[in-house]
Amino acid sequence: MKKDKRAKKNRDGSRFYRLCYAFFAGIVGFLFRIRVVGAENEPDKGRFVVCSNHVSATDPVVICYAFRKHQVRYMAKKELFSIPFVSGLIRILGAFPVDRGGTDVGAIRRAVDMVKEGNCLGIFPQGHRYPTVDPRTTKTKNGAALIATRAEADIMPVYIVRKNNEFKLFRKTYVVIGERIPFADLHYDPQAEGEYARITAEIFDKVCALGEGFAAEQANTKKKQ
């Protein structure tokens, strides 16, 4: 019984987070003009990693807004935790520090443990922000695949749509939530070489496909008008 309650708390987030969400959601939605597509794809429970393209420093806030049933936690570069206002904000969002100067084994272990405990973790496979750039032309890092396979977690692909892949206040932001990818569908083979790179490529391909599918639907809608 206690385990079930803890898992639910991990999914929903702390009481403080839920209060902050209730207070700020309307403000965030107004400033960023967020529209969520595929909200029905958000799972009610289960361990999973959210993987998205990365356009702006506001992306974690936008994704947290889109996922109503879960608190999406993030790894953030440790330098951000020394900036007073930013540090407070990202801590509310459930972020924890990572040293991007090398392989931060401790941060990876913490991320894996968090997912195993039922927390929802958000990762940007690109590793950096790429505004005004087609995400398919960017490089990716293997952190999402590494954490997902070690935690045996499902993947939730997400694509953030902004005009010209550029963030501006009061410009519409679409968050497209794709269908859950079960861990078994990743076909992870711990004995095979290059598995993390392969899985990362497959995950990010599905992420980008969400954006392309959304663009195609928008184009068809305009033609019919």
Regions found by a protein language model. Give the residues of each.
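Non-catalytic C-terminal accessory region of glycerolipid acyltransferases
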Residues: 2-12, 108-225
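A transmembrane-helix-recognition feature enriched in membrane-embedded lipid enzymes
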Residues: 2-38, 44, 84-93
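Short, basic, glycine/proline-bearing loop/turn elements
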Residues: 24, 92-98, 127-131
